[in-house]
Amino acid sequence: MTQRAQDALLSFSQRYVDAWQQQHQSLPRNEELVDIVSPCVEEKSGDAVLWKHYPREQFADFTNVETGIELTLHEDVKTFYGAQFSADMNATFDGNELTLLQIWSDDDFECLQENILGHLVTQRRLKLKPTVFIAATDAELDVISICNLTGNVILERLGTKNRDVLAETLAEFLEKLQPAV
């Protein structure tokens, strides 16, 4: 775990909640997650849940993924997905819109592990450097990822070698993010 990355994640999450509360006078609201149990749920409100991020008591374990792909995941990947439960959060980075992907529940974490494993297997087959996605963009094939070799946060075009460095570290990336509520 990298403490700076964890602090930056928790700080961004709180900035997101604060921005939402200022804009909407409530905790963040999500209709898609209404029937899914999560420690993030603060209140059910009709067809939606009001939520806030929830730090994990114990970091999530990525041994299954690492064993399955025979690759040690970068510590920032483990911190990003292992430090808290949260709904996905919309944000901007240098004016570009994105959705920061998060883990809502333990079941969601199981699905994430399968997706990461599939992503890494595909990259290995295509002889690409390993990355792990952390955010979605409006462009269907462009994702924001952590390079597993360097820890750089990059914008990558899936299935290609097209990669642009956005930040040297996860902490730097998260510190530059602006909540979009």
UniProtKB/Swiss-Prot annotation:
Main localization, broad class: membrane
Name of encoding gene: syd
UniProt superkingdom: Bacteria
Keyword ATP-binding: no
Function per UniProt: Interacts with the SecY protein in vivo. May bind preferentially to an uncomplexed state of SecY, thus functioning either as a chelating agent for excess SecY in the cell or as a regulatory factor that negatively controls the translocase function.
Tagged with keyword Ribosomal protein: no
InterPro entries for the chain: Syd (IPR009948), Syd_sf (IPR038228)
Family note: Belongs to the Syd family.
GO CC, alphabetical: cytoplasmic side of plasma membrane
Bridged cysteine pairs (disulfide): none
HAMAP family cross-referenced by the UniProt entry: Syd
Membrane topology per record: Peripheral membrane protein
Name by which UniProt lists this protein: Protein Syd
Coiled-coil segments: none
Subcellular location: Cell inner membrane
Source organism (scientific name): Vibrio atlanticus (strain LGP32)
Keywords: Cell inner membrane, Cell membrane, Membrane
